[in-house]
């Protein structure tokens, strides 16, 4: 499937930072592609530049404010639609890792596609590295949170920082934490 466009995301579950979705059509074979989660940071960084050199690609960022306003599913779907719109002249076949196509007829879906298809692996790497670099770049602006260490994910240290300092403007305010006494509808439980 030479003209297949692989699509994957990074940042669906973190407490802070953007959702990043990438679409990739490989123009040349690239050795070493795999799901970004199983590759070392060094390997992802090396492959990132090679993927950009040897592909047609499009990357979409949805910030925390948009995620809070519209929801993660809306952001994911609108990002996929933007990718399809930007890459449709190069491909008529779009495949995403996962179990839903969000009602987008042209989009095929397959669980673990990021480990099975080079194009989806490449998209996984572009999304992950783009998001990680963004979190590293903004970390000095939010020194209390150490985003460069956990990239906004819900680590123990990150949750402790939220407990101490509250959420910043790049935190997802609609993502509630049981560790903070928040329930599923966002109301703090009574202390009495």
Curated annotation (Swiss-Prot):
EC number(s) from the headed UniProt entry: 3.1.26.4
Keywords: Cytoplasm, Endonuclease, Hydrolase, Manganese, Metal-binding, Nuclease
PROSITE patterns in the record: RNASE_H_2
Cofactor: Mn(2+); Mg(2+)
GO cellular component entries: cytoplasm; ribonuclease H2 complex
Cofactor note: Manganese or magnesium. Binds 1 divalent metal ion per monomer in the absence of substrate. May bind a second metal ion after substrate binding.
Cross-referenced Gene3D superfamilies: Ribonuclease H-like superfamily/Ribonuclease H (3.30.420.10)
Subcellular location field: Cytoplasm
Disulfide bond sites: none
Main location: cytoplasm
Gene Ontology biological-process entries: DNA replication, removal of RNA primer; mismatch repair
Classification via CDD domains: RNase_HII_bacteria_HII_like
Residue ranges occupied by any RNase H type-2 domain in the UniProt entry: 2-187
Catalytic activity: Endonucleolytic cleavage to 5'-phosphomonoester
Binding site for a divalent metal cation: 8-9, 97
EC class name: hydrolase
Domain of life of the native organism: Bacteria
One MF term in the entry's GO annotations: RNA-DNA hybrid ribonuclease activity
Protein purpose: Endonuclease that specifically degrades the RNA of RNA-DNA hybrids.
NCBIfam families reported for this sequence: PRK00015.1-3
Record family assignment: Belongs to the RNase HII family.
Classification via PANTHER family: RIBONUCLEASE H2 SUBUNIT A, RIBONUCLEASE HII
Protein's UniProt name: Ribonuclease HII
Annotated source species: Aliarcobacter butzleri (strain RM4018)
Upper lineage: Bacteria, Pseudomonadati, Campylobacterota, Epsilonproteobacteria, Campylobacterales
């Amino acid at each position: 499937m030479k003209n297949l466009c692989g699509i994957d995301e990074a940042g669906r579950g973190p407490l802070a930072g953007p959702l990043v979705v990438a679409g990739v059509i490989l123009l040349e074979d690239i050795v070493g592609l795999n799901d970004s989660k199983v590759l070392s940071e060094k390997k992802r960084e090396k492959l990132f530049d090679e993927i950009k050199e040897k592909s047609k690609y499009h990357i979409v960022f949805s910030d925390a404010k948009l995620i809070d306003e519209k929801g993660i599913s809306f952001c994911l779907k609108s990002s996929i639609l933007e990718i399809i719109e930007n890459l449709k002249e190069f491909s008529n076949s779009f495949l995403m890792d996962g179990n839903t196509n969000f009602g987008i007829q042209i989009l095929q879906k397959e669980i673990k596609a990021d480990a099975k298809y080079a194009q989806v692996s490449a998209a996984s790497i572009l999304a992950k590295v783009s998001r990680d670099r963004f979190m590293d770049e903004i970390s000095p602006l939010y020194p209390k949170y150490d985003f460069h260490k956990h990239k906004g994910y819900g680590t123990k240290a990150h949750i402790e920082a939220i407990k101490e300092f509250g959420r910043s403007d790049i935190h997802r305010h609609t993502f509630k934490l049981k560790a903070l006494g928040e329930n599923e509808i966002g109301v703090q439980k009574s202390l009495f």
